[in-house]
Amino acid sequence: MLSGVLIFNQKGENLIFRAFRNDCRPRLADVFRIQVISNAQVRSPILTLGSTTFSHVKHENIYLVAITKSNANAALVFEFLYRLIQLGKGYFGKFDEEAVKNNFVLVYELLDGN
């Protein structure tokens, strides 16, 4: 089960933070930014730090990140992230930083399932 979803721009600015569980704190966004975005040598789409796993994909000029605290099925996590990209493209025509910023309320509604 996902604990949260983050969307960052290329500079590491947090565009979207949606926590689904109480174990997902905003400071986890800083951890991801320091470990992945500011470190160009990171190549793996999965990063585990302690009991927290960050699964991420880069699309256009944004990073989509799923945070899990339990042993989640990685294939399902990435399926969710790629479907979120497709959903964003369907709604906005493209799914990039500008689209997320201009439609952040709708992005939150889509993440909430409303």
Mark where each language-model region is.
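Acidic, low-complexity cytosolic segments
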Residues: 1-114
